[in-house]
Amino acid sequence: MNLHEYQAKSLFAEYGLPVSEGFACDTAQEAVEAAGRIGGNLWVVKCQVHAGGRGKAGGVKVTGDKEEIRAFAEHWLGKNLVTYQTDEKGQPVAKILVESCTDIANELYLGAVVDRATRRVVFMASTEGGVEIEKVAEETPELIHKAIIDPLTGPQPYQARDLGFKLGLNPTQMKQFTKIFMGLATMFVDHDFALLEINPLVITTEGNLHCLDGKIGIDGNALFRQAKIKAMHDPSQDDAREAHAAMFELNYVALDGNVGCMVNGAGLAMGTMDIVNLHGGKPANFLDVGGGATKERVAEAFKIILSDSNVKAVLVNIFGGIVRCDMIAEGIIGAVKEVGVKVPVVVRLEGTNAELGREVLAKSGLDIIAANSLTDAAEQVVKAAEGK
């Protein structure tokens, strides 16, 4: 689960981090009034979406004219913002953040992730702030400095000072950076973050550190104990198919191929996608129906897969370990009849009662292609998707 910038900054403020005064607004009039409440003669207005690259897409504006703020809000509210991190449809804009303008002398980067390699929370800092950190990591990895947080000792001030020296901070800025680092590290654990970014963390013309932006991703598995964070969820930013799948406890991720995949088990699902790719196909999704692949869940899975107009064929790959393949076959038949599937369906069953399951499919009278192996299934579904 991701948070909007204004939500991230509200958490930053709770932990004593320096952020701009700002208000998230639902209407153009609110945006104009927010500028008046903030005061001054220069403001920044930002579209609130779960995506980076807003500035290049026209979703950020610096202005000293309240009527320009009104025009900006009227233009974007209710529309979709398309950036390099969204699909071609973009993300809907429901709120505009109006903030005081900050005078910038230098831009830095500070972020943290749960690193699978070290199995620790790892902080990253760089002098290359305000740009795509992925490009920095790829082209000049030596400019990214890291601090690994030991879960037994927690974050330590010396780690902040080490990063601060590498960023070239002066003694005053070092103290500020240490406070920011310790606050972020504490916040990361307190709220079960999976990702945290301040890009840019700026040095103002007065020489102070300031959190100019904020990006936070939450571990979805921890939301049961994060009621406050869960209440911040904005469903309008979710993929509609992924949100629908979550209602039925289906793990679904939309992709851009034409072969729909329905599999039980995340590992088998990833392997299925790999073998479809190996045989020249492109998966349209990742979908794990889990161990309890009932008729109802299979039917919903078909509905979700087929809601993607790019899907030209569906591969159902089931290993009968927890469930019997004959029961799965009956569920597939019922789902195909209920949903009215119009594209070719290739089914590969293996495991408990696999042969009986294939017999059930053969006797159904439906146009379902039974595969003898995973390789055969991949070859068949790729051909079907190509209309061969």
UniProtKB/Swiss-Prot annotation:
Annotated GO biological processes are: succinyl-CoA metabolic process; tricarboxylic acid cycle
Q: Any idea of its EC number?
A: 6.2.1.5
Q: Pathway, per Swiss-Prot/TrEMBL?
A: Carbohydrate metabolism; tricarboxylic acid cycle; succinate from succinyl-CoA (ligase route): step 1/1
Could you confirm whether the keyword Ligase appears in this record?
Answer: yes
Enzyme class, spelled out? ligase
Any one GO CC term of this protein is:
succinate-CoA ligase complex
One Gene Ontology term of the molecular function aspect:
magnesium ion binding
Residues annotated as binding substrate: 264, 321-323
Q: Where does Mg(2+) bind?
A: 199, 213
User: What's in the keyword line of the UniProt record?
Assistant: ATP-binding, Ligase, Magnesium, Metal-binding, Nucleotide-binding, Tricarboxylic acid cycle
What Gene3D superfamilies is this protein classified in? ATP-grasp fold, A domain, ATP-grasp fold, B domain, Succinyl-CoA synthetase domains
What the record notes about the co-factor is:
Binds 1 Mg(2+) ion per subunit.
* Binding positions (ATP): 46, 53-55, 99, 102, 107
The reaction(s) annotated as catalysed by this protein in its Swiss-Prot or TrEMBL entry are:
succinate + ATP + CoA = succinyl-CoA + ADP + phosphate; GTP + succinate + CoA = succinyl-CoA + GDP + phosphate
Origin: domain of life:
Bacteria
**UniProt cross-references to NCBIfam families, sorted A to Z:** PRK00696.1 (NF001913), sucCoAbeta (TIGR01016)
Q: Which family does it belong to?
A: Belongs to the succinate/malate CoA ligase beta subunit family.
Record note on quaternary structure? Heterotetramer of two alpha and two beta subunits.
What name goes with this protein?
A: Succinate--CoA ligase [ADP-forming] subunit beta
**From what organism does this protein derive?**
Shewanella sp. (strain ANA-3)
